[in-house]
Amino acid sequence: MTAIPTISVDAMGGDLGPAAVVEGIGHALKRWPDRKATYLLHGDEALLAPLLARHPKVAAVCELRHTETLVQMTDKPSEAVRRARGSSMWNAIQSVKSGEAGAIVSSGNTGALMAIGKVILRMKKGVHRPAISANWPTPKGHTVVLDVGANVQCNATQLVEFAIMGEAYHRAVFGGEAPSVGLLNVGQEELKGNDTVREADQLIRKANLDIAYQGFIEGNDISAGGIDVVVTDGFTGNIALKTAEGTARLVAGWVRDALTSSLLAKLAAGLLSLGALERLRQRMDPRYINGGVLLGLKGIVVKSHGGADGEGFASALGLAYVMAQSDFMAQIRANLDKFASFEEQEVAAAS
């Protein structure tokens, strides 16, 4: 943990490219004026230098690392790994590997980011596949959901590893001593769900892990805030996340239309507290919870939404800052070791 962390940024990733990155750092400076950080911007100097010149406060906390090579959003992971050396994404991750930076943020190609991250940083011992986390707003704070897209299919062992990583991640980002953990299922009864989910449930119970496991939970439990960490495969998690984002935009649109539907509605809206309306807007705006961590790598890799604007990218930077300052890597170790030992004993007993 460092007093002033350095965050490495793939400045060429995402739909909006360098403009969103520079604007994002500016928003982060305004949103968290007490957070001191420096940024390594990996990208094309011809594009980044003019943007930094227009934002002197951003330029003051940034160091530009020039490269004209970038990973395209359409690149397949295998192709990206072969061609990515020297790219903005590769160099940004390499800065974490070398110890120059405590975390890396990218809005680029998710598959490529994961593949390159695995090549450069390698997987943590005891983790077979990385998982992408998402911070889900609830009336009680936030629920961590994983996986939300890294693995379309998972086996029971991988789901247990996700539970271990998600629990440690929740403690690192949101605090608390014993966040509750649940497996997403179609019902809470023991016989509900597919074989993989039921097997994962039994593995968690038998392994005697140091987590507050609550058993099966259902989709409606996520937004209620009754569970801190929700574990699922990437196929299910991604659909749930995208559905929630779409619903949030729909409801936000309804609220906006209701407050502007007539002169009387506009006058009533004007009487409401502007602060309250702003807080409501932020709670319903996916940009303010943008950013997921690729858990399981030997380094902090934060994935920003590919379409994130400056406000959204700032949220991903904020998450990277918190993770860089946390002891997540140490917190995850004990339960991974305990589960690995349990699996070895199970294999030995079966042989």
Curated annotation (Swiss-Prot):
Enzyme superclass (EC): transferase
Subunit structure: Homodimer. Probably interacts with PlsY.
EC number: 2.3.1.274
Entries under HAMAP family matching the protein: PlsX (MF_00019)
Keyword Acetylation: no
Function: Catalyzes the reversible formation of acyl-phosphate (acyl-PO(4)) from acyl-[acyl-carrier-protein] (acyl-ACP). This enzyme utilizes acyl-ACP as fatty acyl donor, but not acyl-CoA.
Organism: Maricaulis maris (strain MCS10)
Protein name: Phosphate acyltransferase
Keywords in alphabetical order: Cytoplasm, Lipid biosynthesis, Lipid metabolism, Phospholipid biosynthesis, Phospholipid metabolism, Transferase
A GO molecular-function annotation: phosphate:acyl-[acyl carrier protein] acyltransferase activity
One Gene Ontology cellular component: cytoplasm
GO biological process: fatty acid biosynthetic process; phospholipid biosynthetic process
Family from the record: Belongs to the PlsX family.
Transmembrane stretches, start-end: none
